[in-house]
A protein has these predicted regions:
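Non-catalytic accessory regions flanking glycosidase/transglycosidase catalytic cores in CAZymes
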Residues: 1-185, 190-233
Length: 233
């Protein structure tokens, strides 16, 4: 099919392999072209190649390749949204890369300008998916983040969530209950297979005076106190 290729900057972009770039239109610093992909059924190992050449004082940024029929202004791939239809709630543990997260400071969080697999998906995109689908959401706050991170996270969602859009999406989906946003302190802090267990156990041992009398495991006291701290922030 024919894909849309969009990029910014004065560098050079070329396409090879199973792709052919044509009909490039320059709109100032933004460049738009069409890429025809030709894949012969039964052939394997054939790849699309996109080569970027940056000269002095020239660079290419914001390169996007859109499948046929996809609106470049859309935040999410339509088949992805369609796959979410059966569900009433979305848990974002993996999107937030919660297990084993090393995030501490808000400045180190993934942003829409810079993100990959290591620290998860930007909170702005999580909020946008909630806005678009109207589904209840379950957030998991990484274990090591400081109070400022938690406060900034709350402010971010307060600003990014559009409750008018959420309600419209819920009405369209036939949801009759109010929207709910669940916030969990990390994930499975009782599970010794995750680093959060050691994090909370160390915190509990460091502050024995906060012990509440919980006897269901060494993780219990500070997990509860950690939840209380999280809710206060």
């Amino acid at each position: 099919g024919t894909y849309a290729l969009v990029w910014q900057g004065a560098g050079t972009v070329s396409v090879g392999g199973i792709g052919t770039l044509h009909d490039v239109v320059d709109e100032g610093d933004v460049h738009r072209g069409s890429v025809d992909l030709t894949q012969t059924p039964g052939e394997f190992g054939k790849l699309l190649t996109i080569t970027i050449t940056n000269e002095a004082d020239q660079s290419v940024t914001g390169l996007h390749l859109y499948p046929p029929g996809v609106d470049p202004a859309a935040s999410f791939y339509p088949p992805f949204l369609a796959a979410l239809t059966p569900f009433r709630a979305l848990r974002f543990m993996d999107w937030e890369a919660t297990n084993g997260s090393t995030l501490v400071k808000w400045a180190d969080r993934p942003t829409t300008a810079r993100f990959g697999a290591q620290n998860g998906v930007p909170h702005e995109l999580i909020a946008e998916l909630i806005n678009e689908t109207g589904k209840d959401a379950w957030l998991t706050v990484p274990e090591k983040v400081d109070d400022d991170f938690i406060a900034q996270l709350a402010q971010s969602f307060a600003q990014e969530l559009d409750f008018s859009r959420i309600q419209s999406a819920r009405d369209a989906a036939g949801f009759t209950t109010p929207f709910r946003l669940y916030v969990e302190n990390s994930n499975e802090t009782w599970n010794g297979g995750f680093s959060a267990y050691a994090t909370f156990l160390a915190a509990a041992n460091a502050e024995p005076a906060r012990y509440t009398g919980e006897t269901r495991g060494t993780y219990g006291p500070d997990w509860m106190n950690g939840n209380a701290d999280l809710m206060k922030v």
